[in-house]
């Protein structure tokens, strides 16, 4: 409906219009909180009795699945309707083992889906004594000091402890994608890259 209206208005007004998937770092919590105060029975993304929030833009509920390809199957049809602002965040519990694993995942997404933007978003922690630690560790495994855990809030990384209450609730409910158990049921990667003219293997991994 919105795509049709956008197209119609562009023809009528001879102007360009954009259908954008806007981020909602703070409003997803603020609006849900106000709605809950005014309409106590309204449904939000959180569980009953927990801090209310709405899912960001038109993303899937954060606890929908831990299979990245299941999520991509759903989001691909929707996100390609937007003309800007849309992105799929691949929330990973930890960093991938090496650049080849990251390249392989990007290659599969590029070959099998049409969505325009996606991120690989691992969680990491920072200890003031030992620096970078892969994954979520609220205490340093080496010295026991409290760390800062970083995750992508929407378009950028911030320490989780600095997120608003709604985003913290979202983080607690979020399922990270388990790549070891994610199944791509329609893999056309080899077919798409069959005629690749890259000069080196690493160029198209």
Locate the predicted segments by residue.
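Long, highly charged low-complexity segments enriched in Glu/Asp and Lys/Arg with interspersed Ser/Thr
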Residues: 113-117, 121-123, 165-187
């Amino acid at each position: 409906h919105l795509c049709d209206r956008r197209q119609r208005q562009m023809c009528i007004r001879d102007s360009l219009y954009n259908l954008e998937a806007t981020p909602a770092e703070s409003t997803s919590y603020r609006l849900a909180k106000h709605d809950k105060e005014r309409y106590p029975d309204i449904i939000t993304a959180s569980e009953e009795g927990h801090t209310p929030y709405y899912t960001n833009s038109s993303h899937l509920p954060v606890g929908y699945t831990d299979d990245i390809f299941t999520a991509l199957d759903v989001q691909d049809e929707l996100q390609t309707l937007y003309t800007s602002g849309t992105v799929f965040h691949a929330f990973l519990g930890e960093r991938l083992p090496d650049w080849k694993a990251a390249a392989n995942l990007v290659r599969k997404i590029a070959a099998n889906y049409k969505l325009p933007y996606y991120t690989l978003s691992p969680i990491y922690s920072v200890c003031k004594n030992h620096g970078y630690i892969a994954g979520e560790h609220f205490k340093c495994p080496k010295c026991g000091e409290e760390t800062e855990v970083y995750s992508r809030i929407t378009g950028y990384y911030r320490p989780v402890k600095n997120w608003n209450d709604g985003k913290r609730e979202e983080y607690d409910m979020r399922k990270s994608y388990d790549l070891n158990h994610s199944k791509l049921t329609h893999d056309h990667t080899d077919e798409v890259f069959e005629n690749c003219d890259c000069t080196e293997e690493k160029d198209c991994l």
